[in-house]
């Protein structure tokens, strides 16, 4: 220190530099706008003022000491004092951090709008900056139901009103045009064009939802619809459903993110429509310059959003009545809560709106297929109360902008689609947040069918790469189980994971073992890492025809029947090695596609459908004594066609009918009896 001071003292001619130090630093900090750290910026400006005042004080002191010390010694003392002061300030800044800086060296994706809600406000601004939702607590609870809107919609008439199904006119030209639109969209877009953009839908909420009370003051929302080549009327109906069924004081904006669509109707005509119908003040369109994919499309919409809460929806949706307050109220109570609505069904053929079910918890199997877990007994007792869900379905959820950006938004290393729902779900739970489903918030969704309308993204196996990124960052040692069940994932190149691992470290997130034991605590019961032994397996021979059930490697929604048993005809081929699993469903060996019957009519069809391990339509019981395969939901028994050539169906049980008698190749009677007894207890 002394040596430096003497050296500086020898350079008296440059003493003006030190006097300019404070001014220069202050100017640079101000012009930079303290982007990296608002707190540091405020501190820097104050520090520069202190430096300036210190120099003025030094000048006064030097004037008072001039009669005792030489001019050279004056400057030596001043320089040494200033260096000592700088050293003390540096020591204070370097050691005064009481906790992890959650945003250091981690880019935060914020939009540049002047009205933007700052997702990471400086702690120095007070409690409201740390928790901006404090102002929404403590208010009276009110009913947000818009009775006038209900009455108005009740008077509507026309195709598809009240969510009723619509049929195509019987006309060859219409059928031809409808088929063309079907192939282009994956749903019946011709029917969509027949239905009003403002159509009414059936209120399919639980009856008690109409009596629910929510905070009288709730945060504002930005609703984000990413889309690519969406059919125009379906997209606009999604928009109008949100506008018509949302309190105007809560709906700040709707953002349509056009992911490089080429359809002419989605270009300038879309913006002209918004302007002509005077909704361009609330609906704005963002357009990408290249194909970004669903994940980055959502991220871009979030960056541009100005609402306090971000709501992500698919662009082929219709919001139900009073859908918004149930999503917002839990977030107002705790901004780290993510809320998902119940997702109902818009039929891809007829546009009928119908409920999917009355709730289930989201989960996954070890090949990373999205699955559902049954509600706990406690959750079933409160049909209107939000309940914890380990994993979101992906396309429908509400999250505070503050929490979304604290989590780093979506991992921008994920391409197109796939894995984003696991990535966000895991980090919400593991990083000290919570995720719930809100039964009184319902949004209907079109599940595309028959045709895959979009071009290949040309990015190789992006889904495996996405899964690898999620596994490497969040799943710890459990990732090996995923790699075992989905081998392509383990060999994929995950890319640079430094940023996402840095977020996990700085947020001090919990382990995946904690997630599996505390949040997805019963997943192993329904989707175990090791497949449990089957109760019965092998061929299922029909006594009346002496033929065996053959699923013939068919896919979802396809029917099947009987063929000559492969044990009788070694060259016959087919798919006859079946399993009666611990979940009481019947599936071909090595495949997760199950026997399914959804109706109780006479001769109800039996189809193949993705296994969900939740019983219901896929629950079958083998009655050993009668050799019947009983379906409790329909109350009927599996029946073969008389000549053995038709499809299998369900029919009223008749113990005397050989067409309803089935002989499994191998049956573990003790295991079967135990499992069926346990299943009966669960139903009590």
From Swiss-Prot:
Region of interest: Flexible loop: 448-461
Transmembrane annotation, as ranges: 75-95
InterPro entries: GalNAc-T, Glyco_trans_2-like, Nucleotide-diphossugar_trans, Ricin_B-like_lectins, Ricin_B_lectin
Catalytic reactions on record: L-seryl-[protein] + UDP-N-acetyl-alpha-D-galactosamine = a 3-O-[N-acetyl-alpha-D-galactosaminyl]-L-seryl-[protein] + UDP + H(+); L-threonyl-[protein] + UDP-N-acetyl-alpha-D-galactosamine = a 3-O-[N-acetyl-alpha-D-galactosaminyl]-L-threonyl-[protein] + UDP + H(+)
Pfam families with a match to the protein in the record: Glycos_transf_2, Ricin_B_lectin
Disulfide bonds: 209-440, 431-509, 548-565, 594-611, 637-653
UniProt-annotated glycosylation sites, renumbered to this chain: 198, 232
SUPFAM superfamilies documented for this protein: Nucleotide-diphospho-sugar transferases (SSF53448), Ricin B-like lectins (SSF50370)
Positions contributing to substrate binding: 259, 291, 417, 448
Region Catalytic subdomain A, annotated ranges: 218-330
Binding-site positions, Mn(2+): 314, 316, 445
Lumenal side: 96-684
PANTHER family: N-ACETYLGALACTOSAMINYLTRANSFERASE, N-ACETYLGALACTOSAMINYLTRANSFERASE 4-RELATED
Domain notes: There are two conserved domains in the glycosyltransferase region: the N-terminal domain (domain A, also called GT1 motif), which is probably involved in manganese coordination and substrate binding and the C-terminal domain (domain B, also called Gal/GalNAc-T motif), which is probably involved in catalytic reaction and UDP-Gal binding. The ricin B-type lectin domain binds to GalNAc and contributes to the glycopeptide specificity.
Biological function: May catalyze the initial reaction in O-linked oligosaccharide biosynthesis, the transfer of an N-acetyl-D-galactosamine residue to a serine or threonine residue on the protein receptor.
Name of the protein in question: Putative polypeptide N-acetylgalactosaminyltransferase 10
Organism: Caenorhabditis elegans
